[in-house]
Structures are given as structure tokens and as C-alpha cells.
Amino acid sequence: MWSDPIADMLTRIRNANAAFKESVDLPASNMKRAILEILKKEGYIEDYKYIEDGKQGILKVFLKYKGDRRNRQRVISGIVRVSKPGRRIYVSKDELPKVKSGMGIAVISTSKGIITDKEARKKNVGGEVICYVW
């Protein structure tokens, strides 16, 4: 059993992305599904699919790359877990981070749900910084 399933998910995505895999399988949870929905909406992944397996289910994530088969480039340059079980990182609405000077996104868990840093600025809320993606 893992102590941090979100870090495990991000690591699996990072490793599959580095190896130019088409897809990666993850154990499912509602929080992971919400994070994947943000990554899909922001254009970092192609899509994801929930597969029922009689237990908790599996999320199959389809990764996205730029260019043709010979000259592939990764869409996700970096993905980093920020708030961890041993050290939670919370920010107020005034301290919301800009990732890579606005070129990346921060995924924030707020009272309004799991949203990006840009949406949190619009909704004027702070929360727990889950991860950075660029």
C-alpha cells in the first residue's frame, strides 16, 4: 500500500511520458479522476478512461505528444508533487503560484473543488497546492 497515491499517479505519468508510452494504467479514485480531468482540459493528456475491474477500478490515461512518430516531443515537460502527506502546502488567494511564469499550471484543492491556479484566481479562493505541471 502507498502512503501517497497522488504522488504514485504523477510518477507513473512522468515515467510513461519519458518512455514515450501511448498509455498508462492507474488505480482509480475520485481525486485522481478530478486531476486527470484538469490535465485533459488544459491539453496535457489526450484522454482518460475508467475501466471497471470489480475492485476500485482502473484509470487508463492516454498520453499526448507533439510532432510525428519520428520527431516526437513531450507535451508534459515536468510534473511535480508539491503538497505531500508529511508536509502539506496551503496558499491563500493572494499567494497562488505562477508555474514557469504562467506557462504551466498549478493544481489546487479548494473548497470549490480541484481547480487550476488560474481558476482559483478568478474564483478568489486559496487551498492546498497538489502539483505543478509544465
Curated annotation (Swiss-Prot):
One of its GO terms (biological process) is translation. The keyword RNA-binding applies. PANTHER family: 40S RIBOSOMAL PROTEIN S15A. InterPro entries: Ribosomal_uS8 (IPR000630), Ribosomal_uS8_CS (IPR047863), Ribosomal_uS8_sf (IPR035987). PROSITE patterns: RIBOSOMAL_S8. Part of the 30S ribosomal subunit. Contacts proteins S5 and S12. The lineage of its organism: Bacteria, Thermotogati, Thermotogota, Thermotogae, Kosmotogales. Belongs to the universal ribosomal protein uS8 family. One of the primary rRNA binding proteins, it binds directly to 16S rRNA central domain where it helps coordinate assembly of the platform of the 30S subunit. This is Small ribosomal subunit protein uS8. Keywords: Ribonucleoprotein, Ribosomal protein, RNA-binding, rRNA-binding. One of its GO terms (molecular function) is rRNA binding. It comes from Kosmotoga olearia (strain ATCC BAA-1733 / DSM 21960 / TBF 19.5.1). Coiled coil: none annotated. Disulfide bonds: none annotated. GO terms for cellular component: ribonucleoprotein complex; ribosome.
